[in-house]
């Protein structure tokens, strides 16, 4: 009876048991991805995140192609397969950990396994989906609302005391509408910068290559396609300036 109970527990918590076993490999893979992401930057911070940066997976694939050109190696093939499996599981797990019923555990996993550069006093609420967390910075006192999507593949920098309301979407990559297969385009990707004390209302969407200035307010439901001035209030689709916020 005890054995059956133990088997049931293993089945219920199987995802988390696999995660615990793979914690170290997951951190190593994310560390490699972060190094690749920052490879062409002048420094090792995200303060200049508006620069166009290569995606980590593309760099890894390019490296593998160069190695393959030099000849076949079973060890190299196995290494590549293992890396791809762990990398894929990492992308899967970060989508499932968002539902773990513990704010403390979620933030610990984001910071130390997926290498999200988040301040201890920042808050990431239930259901937030983070992509490429190793290229995401969240400053002191900032709040990420429930069910937000932070697509940090090209880098996202969120300053201090920023408020992202529920279901805010930040997209650093998009598709080319003129391409017959809607493939990605270098002109449709770029980092997003959100200055300190900015407030993004519920269901705001911010597209690639956008800088939202300090203290700016983006009204609920807006779609931001261009830079927003500091302390400006913008609204609409596409977002346009409708006023200014007090600087006091």
Residues of each region from the PLM?
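Flexible, glycine/small-residue-enriched loop-and-beta-strand segment within the central core
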Residues: 100, 106-107, 128-138, 143-211, ...
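Acidic, glycine-centered active-site loop in nucleotide-sugar glycosyltransferases
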Residues: 229-230, 235-238
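A generic "structured core" feature
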Residues: 208, 217-219, 223
């Amino acid at each position: 009876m005890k054995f059956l109970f133990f088997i049931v527990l293993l089945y219920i918590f199987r995802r988390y048991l696999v995660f615990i076993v793979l914690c170290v490999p997951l951190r190593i893979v994310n560390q490699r991805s972060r190094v690749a992401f920052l490879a062409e930057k002048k420094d090792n911070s995200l303060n200049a995140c508006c620069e166009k940066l290569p995606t980590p997976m593309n760099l890894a694939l390019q490296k593998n192609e160069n190695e393959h050109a030099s000849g076949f190696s079973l060890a190299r093939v196995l290494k590549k397969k293992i890396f791809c499996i762990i990398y894929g599981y990492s992308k899967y797990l970060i989508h499932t950990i968002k539902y773990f019923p513990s704010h403390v555990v979620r933030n610990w996993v984001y910071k130390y396994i997926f290498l999200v550069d988040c301040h201890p006093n920042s808050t990431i609420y239930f259901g937030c989906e983070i992509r490429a967390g190793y290229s995401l910075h969240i400053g002191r006192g900032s709040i990420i609302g429930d069910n937000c999507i932070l697509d940090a593949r090209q880098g996202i920098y969120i300053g201090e005391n920023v408020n992202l309301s529920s279901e805010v979407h930040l997209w650093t990559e998009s598709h080319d509408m003129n391409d017959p297969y809607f493939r990605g385009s270098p002109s449709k990707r770029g980092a997003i910068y959100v200055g300190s004390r900015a407030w993004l209302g519920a269901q705001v969407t911010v597209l690639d290559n956008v800088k939202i200035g300090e203290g700016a307010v983006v009204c609920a439901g807006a779609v931001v396609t261009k830079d927003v001035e500091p302390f400006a209030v913008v609204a609409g689709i596409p977002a346009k300036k409708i006023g200014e916020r007090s600087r006091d």
